[in-house]
Swiss-Prot record:
Co-factor requirement: Fe(2+)
Protein's recorded name: 1-aminocyclopropane-1-carboxylate oxidase homolog 7
PROSITE patterns cross-referenced by the UniProt entry: FE2OG_OXY
Biological classification of the source: Eukaryota, Viridiplantae, Streptophyta, Embryophyta, Tracheophyta
Species of provenance: Arabidopsis thaliana
GO annotation (BP), single: biosynthetic process
Family under the similarity heading: Belongs to the iron/ascorbate-dependent oxidoreductase family.
Sequence positions that bind Fe cation: H218, D220, H274
PANTHER family found in the cross-reference section: 1-AMINOCYCLOPROPANE-1-CARBOXYLATE OXIDASE HOMOLOG 10-RELATED (PTHR10209:SF473), OXIDOREDUCTASE, 2OG-FE II OXYGENASE FAMILY PROTEIN (PTHR10209)
Amino acid sequence: MVVKNSIKFNSQSERKSLEETKVPPIFGLPPDALDDKKPTSDFAVPIIDFAGVHKSREAVVEKIKAAAENWGIFQVINHGVPLSVLEEIQNGVVRFHEEDPEVKKSYFSLDLTKTFIYHNNFELYSSSAGNWRDSFVCYMDPDPSNPEDLPVACRDAMIGYSKHVMSLGGLLFELLSEALGLNSDTLKSMGCMKGLHMICHYYPPCPQPDQTLGTSKHSDNTFITILLQDNIGGLQILHQDCWVDVSPLPGALIINIGDFLQLMTNDKFISVDHRVLTNRVGPRISIACFFSSSMNPNSTVYGPIKELLSEENPPKYRDFTIPEYSKGYIEKGLDGTSHLSHYRI
């Protein structure tokens, strides 16, 4: 793992030694933060089949509506992204994270304005403990990185996968618009697809899974997130005050509602709190694609959609810009609280 305030990369033998011993204090969480790691319910995250999305669109929209309103998350199968593309992006993430340390070192940065960033985790600088993972971030749209600036290990896989994600994202925003009772192009016309960045996580095996987390409890500062996880598991969501496993489903993609969409829908859709547990087995790989321009320049002002408001349903949030929201979100860190509360009227 990358050590705080130091650009130091351990050899594979050193990493293996660390994984076989114990969790360093910098990653340790207090016991009360980890006393509920086992699922506390038998709930199951909704699974929606997109195979008939064009023939039975209304039925799919109703399922998305129910999931977005009650869960804030759902899994999609038969979504149109080839299995070979899903496998290749996962393989590409592994190839990069298991590259020679000197190769990865050249990409290490804490500068969020760079188009490709390799880092341990930003929580080390804003929270009391770090998370047990390595990650890289890449901005793919609207101003994609020069392919030559991307690591060879994952370059083609990232470019290919992001094209499929943009296509699926377009369909999802149409269906979500219809689920709100609006024209299908409403969310796209409001700029919800203006930005896409990809965060690729590598969770090494953890010698003491009861001592730390892979990712702390948080919601996403996005419109929506499209997540691909491998078969190891560990992702949990908070539903009705219970932690629920998001069980791996081969070939499926996970869609979760982000903070921006909860605000814009005036709480009609909910942004889901989630976290990732550590595991003695690994590495665990996940690829999260965020529809959000994040810290990139964007002066668009967002707020509750006027067509959804009425005397009985007045605005619950004040307006915001994405850079403004993202700055506060990052400064706050993954402390288990929602940044949405700062915008509630």
